[in-house]
From Swiss-Prot:
Protein name: NAD(P)H-quinone oxidoreductase subunit J, chloroplastic
Pfam families to which the protein is assigned, alphabetical: Complex1_30kDa
Protein role: NDH shuttles electrons from NAD(P)H:plastoquinone, via FMN and iron-sulfur (Fe-S) centers, to quinones in the photosynthetic chain and possibly in a chloroplast respiratory chain. The immediate electron acceptor for the enzyme in this species is believed to be plastoquinone. Couples the redox reaction to proton translocation, and thus conserves the redox energy in a proton gradient.
The protein's assembly and partners: NDH is composed of at least 16 different subunits, 5 of which are encoded in the nucleus.
Cellular component terms per the entry's GO annotation: chloroplast thylakoid membrane
HAMAP family on file: NDH1_NuoC
Subcellular location, principal: plastid
Coiled-coil residue spans: none
Location of this chain's protein in the cell: Plastid, Chloroplast thylakoid membrane
UniProt record similarity statement: Belongs to the complex I 30 kDa subunit family.
Length: 158
């Protein structure tokens, strides 16, 4: 079933795939990594000026990684927000997605956390570095194929 935003994107010739609706009735769309930045700018101009959250997850061991964006558009009033969920899937061998930091500044720490935990590289992010794990940490802890070390010694600050 095609939602309102999906119909609008089709009308304007923007490539995407409708994934239906979630349990709250929020439309979910899949965007290719190479199209994501331009579609993000278009969505911002169209009125989706609030990035509610960004997260990422490992779809399956050895499979794809996903970066998920929850966007909100408030046109008629605060009590009637229009929401959409965007999913961008990337291969785990070279997980690269254009950063939308320059579109929604609030994605800064969220993209950094996705990088730190899953190793998704957000191209053109101004400060893409580990945010939760020490810089010396090896691997991506939230990947399903991650093997946790038996021991990790945290160095003292002095």
């Amino acid at each position: 079933m095609q939602g309102r935003l999906s119909a609008w994107l089709v009308k304007h010739g923007l490539v995407h795939r409708s994934l239906g609706f979630d349990y709250q009735g929020i439309e979910t769309l899949q965007i290719k990594p190479e199209d994501w930045h331009s579609i993000a700018v278009i969505l911002y101009v169209y009125g989706y000026n609030y990035l509610r959250s960004q997260c990422a997850y490992d779809v399956e061991p050895g499979g794809l990684l996903a970066s998920v964006y929850h966007l909100t558009r408030i046109e008629s009033g605060v009590d009637q927000p229009e929401e959409v969920c965007i999913k961008v899937f990337v291969p785990r061998r070279n997980p690269r997605i254009p950063s939308v930091f320059w579109v929604w500044k609030s994605v800064d720490f969220q993209e950094r956390e996705s990088y730190d935990m899953l190793g998704i590289f957000y191209e053109n992010h101004p400060r893409l570095k580990r945010i939760l794990m020490p810089e010396s940490w090896i691997g991506w802890p939230l990947r399903k194929d991650y093997i946790a070390p038996n021991f990790y010694e945290i160095q003292d600050a002095y």
